[in-house]
Amino acid sequence: MEFSLQIVVRHLEHSDALEARVRKDVAKLLSSHPRMVSCRVTVEELGKHHRQGRQFQVRIDVRTPGKEIVSRRDHHEDVYVALREAFDAMRRQLKDAAKLARGEVKTHPAPRRAEVTRER
């Protein structure tokens, strides 16, 4: 199966180190979830906050057969921390989706309903 990766950087100067980090994290995701069809990683600088300085947002869109999963992490001062948190969230979401597909999700019994009987 062919895999496509798209890296988008907005309002921020493109960095080879940032791209290498994204590629490394995507390769890690791909090794644990080989059924991924495509991945789009968007790194965006939201602007400057008057107290915290620069703010970064990372959004990851992953397509698997029959499903699209989105992970988005807002407002972090360090772009690499925002990347780490977004990829950690995506890893958890992919793991949960795989469990759901295998049917390993815990099911709860239907709640009991009480019947009121009146004796006359």
Model-identified regions with their sequence ranges:
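N-terminal, polar/charged subdomain of small-to-medium soluble alpha/beta proteins
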Residues: 1-120
